Structure formats: C-alpha cells, structure tokens
Amino acid sequence: MESLIGRSFDVIALNEQKKKKRKFILITIAVIFVCAAIFYLGFHWFVNRKYSSYKVEYSTYVKDGNSMKYIAYDDGIIRYGRDGVTAVDRKGQSVWSGSYDMAEPKADACGSSVVVADIGGKDLFAYKGEDTGVSFSVDYPIVQACISEQGVVAVVMEENSSNTIALYDPFQKSEQLLAEIPTNVEDGYPVDVDLSPDGSSVVAAYLCVTAGTAQSRVAFYNFTDVGKNANCLVGAHNYNDTLISKVSFMGNSDVCLFGESGFYLWTNMKQPKQAGKKEFKEEIQSAFLDDAHVGVILQKNSDTGLMKVYTADGAEVLNTSVASDYTNVQIAGGEILLCSTTHCAVYRLNGVKKFDKTLKSQISYFFPANKTN
C-alpha cells in the first residue's frame, strides 16, 4: 500500500510540475508577444511620427544670401556666388572655401569633389574637399561642366559650328586633357551631360532637327579600354517622340534619362542597353533621384501634382498627391524634401508626410541637417 501511495504522490507531483512548466511557457510566450507588439507599435510610431512645429538650433548669417546658389554636397551643401564657393556642414558651419571672380558661376559636386565653371566664359575651379583648389581654362566658351569623385571634370564647350565634350584631370600637373569628343551640327546641340562618379563614362543628350522635326539623340561614351574607338562612343539611341532634357547617373553603371512625360533607365555603360521605362499621360513638372530611386511630380492641375517614386528596377514605392508649386525637390536619406519660396515639406518613402510648414522668411535652399528625428 505504501508503495502505491508513494507512486500516486509522485504522479501528482509530476503533474503539478508539468502544469507549472506549461504555465511558465505560456506566460513567457505571452510576455514575448506583448513585448514584440509594444516594439512594433513603438517602431511604427517612431518612423511615422509627424511634426507641426520646429525649433531653430543653428543660425548662420550669409552675406549677400539672396544672390547665392546652393547644391547638395557630401555631408552638407555647397554655397556659391560670383566671388567664391563655401562648403557648409549640416550645422551651418564653413568647412572650406575658395575665391574666384565669375560672371555666371555654375557648380557641380560628386562626393567631396566640386567644380565651379563660368558659363559662357572659359575658367573653371576644382576642389577636393579643401581650400587649395586648382584653376584651369579651356579654349572655348563653357556650356556645362560636371565632376567625378576623383576630381575628373567633363566640360561641354561651344565652338562656332560645333560643340566639344572634353575630359580633364585638373589635379594633374601635366596632360590635364584626358579625352576630347568633337560633335558637329548633324549630331545636334548638347542639352545635358553627366559624368559617372568614377569618371569612366559620359552620357550626353542632344537636340536634333530632322526633316523639320525636333528629336533627341542620347550618346554613351566610355573612356576605359572598351571605349578606345572613334570618339569613345559605345552606344547611342534616338528618341523620336520625346525630348530628353536631363540625364543623370545612378552609380557608375546605371543612367536615368528624363523626358517630357517619362523616364528611361539604361544600364551597363560598356555596352549600354535600356533596362526599363515609365511613361505618363501627364507632363513631368519635377524630377529627382538618388542611386536607388527615381521620382517625378506630374502636373495634375494648376494646384495639385502627383508624386511618384520608383526603385531602380522600375517598381513603384510611392504614389501621393502634393502641391504643384514646389520649386525644388530632392531625395536624401530615404526622405523626399520639397520647398517653394516660403513653404517646405518632408515625405517619407512610405507616403507619410513627416513635416509641412509655411515659414516667415524666404527659403533659398532646403537640405537635411543632423538627423535626430
């Protein structure tokens, strides 16, 4: 009998132990689930929170601020005018500066490299993240200039009956001219040119007139061993039904061509081929991109635009209505920044409007600062 009673107590104890273990497991699972839910809700709130006000953290006086121009640069901006250029960090502090005297300066930046060209003149200044920039001159009036991360500069020059695209390394003491691509009247007039970040490729959009009809021709040039043929030309394509007004590299091997009502994605700059396109019924009012996204604002009516953002392979990630009066749009750090004369807004790529505010003062440029929110 005692052995049976002892066994029954053992069974009861074992069952109690199983119940406690099961209860502990259930409580643990419940705690994990609750913590996961709290984390998800907190993270969702954090990435989708909206702001209706702002606080001034940094303020810097800019002499002749209304005459200054701005472009994105490295981890801040470039501020430039007729008598000089200044690199500014996200706190508004000057990082480096350079002086010159130009009638119509136009700047371009890639990484820490900057070029400022005197449009219509013959002088250029190039900088590599420091004050001691270098100056150089070309033989003909400058139409456009752009720079690579290494400091290689592509310059479009206008001659009497033709145009020339020349590649320079201004930081070399000898043989600064690396390559020269002459064009003639039959090739058309270069509307826009861009240089790859590594300086190995150039894409140029030309405006041509054939049988009285305007059309676009896009040419791809490569300066590696692959492009060592006549004029370094490795590919070209005619767009008969649309005018290409802007060309932009997305990294070293991908290019986006913007037309009146669509954009076209090209890849492989050694053997260029069109990888995708998006065409719209509405006219493109603004266009913007980074290495991973292409965005457009389409004109819906006089007051409203439609903002669409796509990945580099053409997948749509954003489709939302915005005001149509924005004069500057850019994408930075996974957010879209828009501004007009006195109004600015920030959208996340998931469509959430992070910030929307009308300011008391006139906006010259809108760019991301130190990201704490």
PLM feature spans:
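Hydrophobic membrane-insertion alpha-helices, especially the h-region
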Residues: 25-43
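Non-cytosolic head/periplasmic domains of membrane-anchored proteins
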Residues: 105-205
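Structural motif
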Residues: 44, 84-86, 122-126, 161-168, ...
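N-terminal Lys/Arg-rich, disordered targeting/topogenic segments
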Residues: 1-24
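Repeated scaffold domains used in trafficking and secretory/extracellular systems
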Residues: 63-72, 101-112, 140-151, 185-194, ...
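Aromatic (tryptophan-biased) beta-strands that constitute blades/sheets of beta-rich domains
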Residues: 47-66, 89, 93-102, 132-138, ...
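Solenoidal tandem-repeat scaffolds enriched in leucines and small polar residues
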Residues: 163-258
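Extracytoplasmic/periplasmic/luminal assembly and interaction segments
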Residues: 70-120
